[in-house]
Amino acid sequence: TLWEQNAGSGYRPGKGDGFDYQLDSKATYANASPVTDGNLVVFSYGNGDLVAYDMGGKELWRRNIQKDYGDFCFQWTFSASATLHAGKLYLPILQRNEPVHGRGKPNAPSFLLCMNPQTGKTIWQHQRHSNANKESLESFGTIIPHKGQLLVAGGDVLTGHDPATGNEIWRW
């Protein structure tokens, strides 16, 4: 082991009770895969935490997607893995549009997030609409870079996006 860090529990406090909770015994809130470009490594957790470290184990930045964009609206837990590509960090938040288990808000948007991997700051956010219903809106897939586009599967569709803006190029 070259280094070890405690990035946090991955859980978040229960509403009003001050205790951590887990919604599902099948999910640990640390189901997403870390991603690296050989210079840094980024971990994402089901509670919305994103944490980046350099290759020596020094924390570079930390942020929480739920704090920045509102409570997730997932049946189980958020577990999409981030993608590092061409000097940018991409993360899909493809969620349902109605509260579930008391979490989320009506008409919660699904979106793609592009961040600076060195700082964690948002470069762009692009809403991704779908006509799917309830749990069919949820996806935990990883964004795939392919031929100058970002491929995103979920919400009953496959879409191609411009990596510079997030704008949708095509939909199938």
Annotate each language-model stretch with its function:
Residues 1-172:
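Noncatalytic, solvent-exposed loop/strand surfaces
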